[in-house]
Each structure stands twice: as C-alpha cells, then as structure tokens.
C-alpha cells in the first residue's frame, strides 16, 4: 500500500496537516484581524484597495469550488486582502453526513494552507443539526474573531431553532472574542457582535432608493 503523503489526491500531496478530532480536521490558528470592508470572493479580481478589505465566501459553493481544485492558483489573489474568511462550504441537514464532514475538512484544509502562506484567516463557523456538534467545531480556535451567517435560516421555524442551538454551542465551546455577523441578527444572539449587511439586504436597499 502506498504511503498516503505521496499520493496526489485531494490535495494531500501539497500538505498533510496534523488533524484535530476523530476526522483529523486541520487547525485554524488564531489571527489578529483588522479590516474596513467585507466583500465576496466573486468580487475579488475586480476589487480596488484590497489591503483594507476582508474576503468572505457567503456565496453558492460553485463560485469557489475552484479554490479547492486549484489552491495554488489563488494564493497571490487572496494574499492581497487584509484577511480572508475560511470557505463557507455548505452543511445542509439533508446532505449525507460524509459530505458534511468532507466540506468541513475542505474548509479547514484551505484555511490552514492559506495561513502557511502568511494569509490571515477568520474562521467561518457553520453547523447543520445537533449531531454535527460532535465534529463541526473541530479545528476552530478559541477566543478568536469568527464569522457566521444567518442568511437562509430565519424564515423557517425549524431552521431558526437549529441556528440558535448551534449559536449557543459555538459560544460555549469557542468563546469567541468577536463575531462578524453576516445577515439578520436574531434577538436571542449575544456576545461581541459586529453586524455586516448581507448582499440581499444591500440589493433591496438599492432597489428602494431607485423608486
């Protein structure tokens, strides 16, 4: 049997990190973070004054799958920004558990790989249901600045409950010093929260101004 570190498979030949937990999730280190604006990866190439901005991935997964497929091709682009969020690969509750864990692993592998190249990373915290709590916080730093999104979770009773349960669990386990909150903030959420308007909100505001 081949030694796995020499197999060009799922980026293992690029770097093999020591992992955390049962699924060997790469660790994201705690970084000191400062930025003036929060923009999506889909605007990265056209962005001006990128040194003052943080790059996020609150987008459809297909828009940043290429980062996993060709990670070295995007190091120079990403390194132009003040900091970058770890990729927000989806953890939908109806996804098979294996896919959810794989997406969590990919998020952490890319974030840890970027940190190896001197890029500052904000951990994007995500979960699906209560069962995911067994692994979805593996590899996340404690007492760090983190980011979460409530987009798509507040228009359904069950989704909203799952979001709040995960939020409470995040606060207990990670004790974040600051939470960059993308989207609507439920009244039950607490902590040192900095709200960022989601693209959908900004779009609605523009449409209202045009009337």
Regions found by a protein language model. Give the residues of each.
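SEC14/CRAL-TRIO lipid-binding/transfer domains and related phosphoinositide-recognition modules
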Residues: 1-93, 109
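Alpha/beta catalytic cores of nucleotide-metabolism and tRNA/nucleoside-modifying enzymes
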Residues: 3-4, 209-211
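Eukaryote-skewed repeat-based solenoidal scaffolds used as protein-protein interaction platforms
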Residues: 47-48, 55, 67-208
């Amino acid at each position: 049997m081949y030694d796995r570190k020499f197999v060009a498979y799922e980026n293992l030949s690029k770097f093999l990190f020591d992992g955390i937990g049962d699924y060997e999730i790469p660790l994201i280190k705690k970084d000191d973070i400062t930025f003036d604006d929060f923009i999506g990866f889909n605007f990265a190439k056209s962005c001006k004054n990128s040194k003052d901005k943080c790059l996020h991935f609150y987008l459809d997964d297909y828009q940043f799958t290429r980062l996993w497929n060709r990670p070295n091709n995007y190091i120079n682009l990403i390194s132009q920004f003040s900091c970058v969020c770890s990729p927000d690969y989806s953890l939908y509750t109806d996804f098979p558990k294996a896919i959810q864990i794989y997406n969590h692993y990919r998020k952490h592998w890319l974030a840890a790989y970027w940190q190896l190249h001197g890029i500052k990373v904000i951990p994007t915290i995500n979960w699906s249901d209560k069962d995911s709590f067994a692994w979805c916080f593996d590899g996340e730093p404690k007492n760090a600045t983190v980011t979460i999104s409530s987009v798509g979770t507040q228009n359904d009773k069950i989704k909203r409950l799952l979001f709040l349960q995960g939020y409470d669990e995040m606060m207990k386990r990670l004790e974040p010093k600051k939470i960059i909150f993308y989207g609507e903030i439920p009244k039950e959420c607490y902590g040192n929260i900095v709200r960022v308007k989601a693209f959908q909100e900004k779009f609605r505001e523009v449409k209202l101004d045009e009337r």
